[in-house]
């Protein structure tokens, strides 16, 4: 319907405005205009709420459950790396913008990794492996940093009392 098309347009417009205003706030802060930065940030928060309202309207009045969100995210990332960015890279190259073509190609690779991450997370959710694994793991509380070794994360952090939802597998990336 025209109304659905308008909802998608409103969602896209508000989403883009939010990002622009966040970028503008950074510039204003850098240039020493704290009040102007705060106004951009406030407006960005307003735009986020407007986008959320339209997104909910597009999805029956609420944001879908986590599994659906993971599937939607993976699908969006898939379209970006297989269709959108390759097309944009080709067009940029044809029009004489090799640097932009290279950036589109590199970002496509990032989007592929995003898709893979979302699909793996969806599998973890489907298989009840978000907070439990078959082998011992190091779990870390995202709130206070407490670590626990076990097959599943504690139901409650013994240090800060945050629920199991705050635990994740501890990352070693250094």
Language model: regions and residue ranges:
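Non-heme di-metal
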Residues: 1-174
